[in-house]
Amino acid sequence: NTINVITLGCSKNVYDSEILMGQLKANQMDVKHETSDDANIVVVNTCGFIDNAKEESVNTILEQIERKEEGKIDKLFVTGCLSERYKPDLEKEMPNVDEFFGTKDLPNLLKSLGADYKHELVGERLTTTPSHYAYLKISEACDRKCSFCAIPLMRGGHKSTSIEDLVTESEKLASKGVKELILIAQDLTYYGLDLYKERRLSELMTKLSEVEGIEWIRIHYAFP
């Protein structure tokens, strides 16, 4: 089997797809990113944040359903924010999708793809960005209850990744030639409050700046 992962939405989804593909590669599986030529299994990683993104996600799923009906692919799986937020509706409207998964269902998605979730793979990813830079997701989700934002509904409460694991991941990226880290999260300035009971973004950046080979660090998604 060859698995094609299609990524829609923001850089955090790109990161999630890279983690998925890293797990698949560690399971000795043939995985592609956004190519439809020779893959017989497709995973669509969706966005559900704004109307345009929802429309793009739905249209992409429908395109892949059509390809499945034409016999061009054997199986179709959908994951990500749209699937997390609207799973019952999507299952009803799109019965030709083999299975829908939410934002925290990676082990179950891997199982359906015939792979095992490997807990020991700290920082192992199949990067899709140009070789000189990579995204580094330092935390997941958000505790703020802003009336205009659905992220807590789709991603849950804020959860930081430890400084040690992020340094390990950065060292692995640097060993592959990455020179620039782009730090991403729902809210970078919240980093560390759950793990360390205080904000630790500055300490994290100091540690990352000490990683040999990393020359630039950029921060995205700060609040306010």
Show where each model-derived region lies.
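Alpha-helix-loop-beta-strand connector modules within alpha/beta enzyme cores
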Residues: E198-W216
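Proteins enriched for Cys/Gly/acidic motifs involved in redox and nucleic-acid/cofactor modification
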Residues: N1-Y191
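Periplasmic OmpA-like peptidoglycan-binding domain that tethers envelope proteins to the cell wall
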Residues: D194-L195
